[in-house]
Amino acid sequence: MKLSEAVGKRVENLLAERNMTQYQLYKNGGIPRSTISVTVDGKYKTVKLDTIYQIVATLGITLKEFFDDTLFDDVEDWGIIEGVIRY
């Protein structure tokens, strides 16, 4: 599985666990709606760490908790995480 697909599925699963919509994530976290949509759909070629950080902060979990999921066990392209956390 590609990293972008695993990230998208993980965000989708976390939203479902919290009975939360992409719109609520946008409203609560200030993350652009288009960014959330493209992230959940796994359409990014690269995954921005800043984006993942904003999402996990809004959901109230850590980056470690986000990536500690079996979805990431078979990720093939870990090298495409882009960016530095600025928080």
Locations of regions flagged by a protein language model:
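A short, Lys/Arg-rich alpha-helix, primarily the initiator
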Residues: M1-T21
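Residues that mark the N-terminal boundary/hinge immediately upstream of a DNA-recognition element
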Residues: R10, T21, K48-T51, T62
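DNA major-groove recognition helix of helix-turn-helix
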Residues: L15, V40, T51
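The alpha-helix within a helix-turn-helix
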Residues: L15, Y26, V56
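Short alpha-helical DNA-recognition segment
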Residues: N19-V38
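Alpha-helical DNA-recognition elements
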Residues: V38, G42, Q54, F72
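Short, basic-rich loop-to-helix N-cap that marks the start of a DNA-contacting helix
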Residues: K43-A57
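Short, charged recognition helix plus adjacent turn
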Residues: D68-Y87
